[in-house]
A protein has these predicted regions:
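A Rossmann-like FAD-binding core segment of flavoenzymes
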Residues: 76-84, 90, 99, 165-269, ...
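Beta1-alpha1 glycine-rich phosphate/pyrophosphate-binding loop at the start
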Residues: 2-77, 113, 155-185, 348
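Eukaryotic N-terminal low-complexity, Ser/Thr- and Lys/Arg-rich leader segments
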Residues: 1-12, 218-224, 364-373
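Glycine-rich active-site loop/strand segments that organize a redox cofactor
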Residues: 41-47, 51-56, 107-137, 338-339, ...
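C-terminal, flexible cofactor-proximal segment of oxidoreductases
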Residues: 10, 291, 300-373
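FAD-site-proximal beta/loop scaffold in flavoenzymes
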Residues: 123-142, 232-302, 306
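FAD-binding core/adjacent interface of flavoenzyme oxidoreductases
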Residues: 2-11, 73-145, 239-241
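Glycine-rich Rossmann-fold phosphate-binding loop(s) that bind the pyrophosphate
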Residues: 17-20, 148-150, 290
């Protein structure tokens, strides 16, 4: 294959995490003929940019899971990495299996509440069924409360009202502004207006005080949701879109001194973890001052993989520089807001560029597979 480089037989890159950053790094190394092993808890890549649509649209979830084996063959291993031994340069899986590395790319991502995240060791067929079952819970509910009005909560509320215009959807959020805090004020206001136009009821400046007592993601008629404003909201279904945290379990015991307070890994401009020239952090687990986005993870992966190749071929390392915020928020298939490089985008561009397809086609193309009908 064109672009392959001459590699020492001792070189073996291990990629921990098969999200957007992980598959981008794997494809880059594969193209250049660099031996690697991609490890993930699921047996398929989850295009979780489309997870919320898979939560409301029956039959859609199968388009959001792309099997790793068909793309990477024996270069993929399913399992959970529980430990990294930097002395022996091995990663240890939960089944006791050890995999040696010469270079390590950590793409562990974040975990959070279903349906926005799917974080359990699973088969993709089982994961697809979980989303199909969740669609039925939404279908059964008359009133849905979405807790958390960040980007995920905004998208969730909009997807429900787009697919089910007869359902009452209430979004509860502690801030007066919705969506990501890093967005331009005008974009956040636009997101708020789209929600209102879609008929979402907004309870802003409020926190849910009894979340721990509520059964999430299951339709239960007459659930009472309490806020810190002494309000009670009655709903049939509660969906939590808050509390994502960095997946640091794989490296916490070994790389504690390299971790920021959030659990992310401190990196230099080459995305090398502090104190290591052969360990890289990519995506959400890299402590960079920018939003945690699939788009950024892909950029990180290209830098990390390129730097591994450059280090093997005696070339200078490339640097990663954060830029102005680029973020597109899909608010159902017919609406979207966002900005590019710090500039607000027209809604029709976001709708056409992201909301209609959620870029599912792009992941299938990058994985070299054909999407199911």
């Amino acid at each position: 294959m064109g672009g392959q480089v001459s590699i020492d037989e001792n070189v073996h890159v291990v990629i921990v995490g098969g999200g957007f950053g992980g598959i981008a790094a794997a494809q880059h190394l594969k193209h250049h003929g660099v031996p690697f092993m991609l490890i993930d808890i699921l047996d398929a890549f989850h295009h979780n940019v489309a997870a919320l649509r898979a939560s409301v649209k029956a039959g859609f979830a199968k388009q959001t899971f792309i099997p790793y084996k068909e793309t990477f063959g024996l270069n993929f291993l399913q399992g959970r990495v529980t430990q990294i031994d930097s002395e022996t340069q091995t990663v240890v899986l939960d089944n006791g299996k050890q995999v040696r590395y010469s270079h390590l790319i950590l793409c562990t991502g974040t975990s959070g509440h279903f349906p926005g995240k799917h974080n359990s060791v699973d088969t993709y067929q089982s994961a697809i069924q979980k989303y199909e079952d969740f669609v039925k819970e939404i279908q059964e509910a008359n009133t849905v409360v979405v807790v958390g009005g960040g980007t995920t909560g905004v998208e969730m509320a909009a997807e429900i009202r787009t697919e089910f215009t007869d359902k009452k959807v209430i979004l509860i959020h502690p801030r007066e502004e919705v969506a990501d805090p890093d967005l331009l004020p005008s974009v956040k206001e636009q997101a708020k207006q789209v929600l209102l136009e879609k008929g979402v009821e907004l309870l802003l400046g409020r926190k849910v005080t009894n979340l721990d007592e509520l059964e999430l993601n299951v339709c239960r008629k007459g659930m009472e949701i309490k806020t810190n404003k002494n309000e009670q909201v009655t709903a049939d279904l509660v969906i939590c879109c808050t509390g994502n945290k960095i997946n640091s379990d794989a490296y916490r015991s070994t790389l504690t001194t390299c971790m920021a307070e959030s659990g992310a890994l401190k990196v230099n401009q080459h995305l090398q973890v502090e104190g290591f020239d052969n360990v890289y952090a990519v995506g959400d687990c890299a402590n960079l001052n920018e939003p945690k986005l699939a788009y950024h993870a892909g950029l990180h992966a290209a830098v990390a993989a390129t730097n591994i190749i450059n280090s093997l071929t005696g070339k200078c390392l490339t640097s990663y520089r954060t830029g102005n915020v680029t973020m597109l928020i899909a608010m159902g298939k017919d609406a979207g807001v966002g900005q590019f490089n710090g500039y607000k985008l027209p809604q029709f561009l976001v709708t056409k560029g992201k909301s209609q397809s959620l870029l599912v086609w792009k992941s299938w193309r990058e994985m070299g597979q054909k999407a199911p009908n």
